[in-house]
């Protein structure tokens, strides 16, 4: 096993416990990130469907608005001067809200009407009905544009977050967890090798102690035998000396 395929750590029981704890944390984090990615993916697909639906509806609304504008121009003539004379401030404004999806903040744009209708009396002389229809159609178009902008902003935000989350999930699944597993295997193999070496060392020590004990027992036996032989020789010498004296007298 190459050193780059595992974490640089000294093999010990404490290191093994630490790596098992890190493995449990990485596995739990992988599961949580996977659930987050799935939740974001579901919301992503939902927003994508709404974008397609809104764009389809947007085409129809803009077509009706363009047709209404043509009707107004045909009925009342050029209304540019009327609009410019009555314009003061925007009637449709936007407020921003926030939505939280699995820890991701998504901006939401909502249109609202502020103040009175500036062009309420415009076109009463002629073409008032067509002008009212034109205002209604373009207000619907503006609201759809705001809704579409909100959806597309959320779409882009979710797309970026999903890519980052998937990269983290893949990194944990294919890099971090396998590296921790290889580190644990390395620690276990090194500890087993140390245990075998310790067992062999203890066995050699026991063998040496056994040999030393046998040598000591053998030496004591020899010394005891020599002592017994010396005592027997001494007794024999005493007996021999006693016999010689009897012969002389």
Curated annotation (Swiss-Prot):
Tagged with keyword Transport: yes
Pfam families: ATP-synt_D
Function: Subunit of the V1 complex of vacuolar(H+)-ATPase (V-ATPase), a multisubunit enzyme composed of a peripheral complex (V1) that hydrolyzes ATP and a membrane integral complex (V0) that translocates protons. V-ATPase is responsible for acidifying and maintaining the pH of intracellular compartments and in some cell types, is targeted to the plasma membrane, where it is responsible for acidifying the extracellular environment.
Family recorded in the similarity comment: Belongs to the V-ATPase D subunit family.
GO molecular function: proton-transporting ATPase activity, rotational mechanism
Protein's name according to its UniProt entry: V-type proton ATPase subunit D 2
One GO CC annotation: proton-transporting V-type ATPase complex
Oligomer and partners: V-ATPase is a heteromultimeric enzyme made up of two complexes: the ATP-hydrolytic V1 complex and the proton translocation V0 complex. The V1 complex consists of three catalytic AB heterodimers that form a heterohexamer, three peripheral stalks each consisting of EG heterodimers, one central rotor including subunits D and F, and the regulatory subunits C and H. The proton translocation complex V0 consists of the proton transport subunit a, a ring of proteolipid subunits c9c'', rotary subunit d, subunits e and f, and the accessory subunits VhaAC45 and ATP6AP2.
Keywords, comma-separated and alphabetical: Hydrogen ion transport, Ion transport, Transport
Matching InterPro entries: V_ATPase_D (IPR002699)
């Amino acid at each position: 096993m190459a050193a780059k395929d595992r974490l640089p750590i000294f093999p010990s029981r404490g290191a093994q416990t630490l790596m098992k704890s890190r493995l449990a944390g990485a596995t739990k984090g992988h599961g949580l990130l996977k659930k987050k990615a799935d939740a974001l993916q579901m919301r992503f697909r939902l927003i994508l469907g709404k974008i397609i639906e809104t764009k389809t509806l947007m085409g129809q609304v803009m077509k009706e608005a363009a047709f209404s504008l043509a009707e107004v121009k045909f009925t009342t003539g050029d209304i540019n001067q009327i609009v410019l004379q009555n314009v003061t401030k925007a009637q449709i404004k936007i407020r921003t809200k926030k939505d939280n999806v699995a820890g991701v903040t998504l901006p939401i744009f909502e249109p609202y009407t502020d103040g009175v209708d500036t062009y309420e009396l415009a076109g009463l002389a002629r073409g008032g009905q067509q002008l009212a229809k034109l205002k209604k159609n373009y207000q619907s178009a503006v609201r759809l544009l705001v809704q579409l902008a909100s959806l597309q902003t959320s779409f882009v935000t979710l797309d970026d977050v999903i890519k980052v989350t998937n990269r983290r999930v893949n990194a944990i699944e294919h890099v971090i967890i396998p590296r921790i597993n290889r580190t644990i295997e390395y620690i276990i193999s090194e500890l087993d090798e140390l245990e075998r070496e310790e067992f062999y060392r203890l066995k050699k020590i026991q063998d040496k102690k056994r040999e030393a004990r046998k040598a000591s027992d053998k030496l004591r036996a020899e010394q005891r035998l020599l002592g017994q032989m010396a005592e027997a020789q001494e007794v024999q010498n005493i007996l021999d000396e006693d016999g010689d004296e009897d012969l002389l007298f």
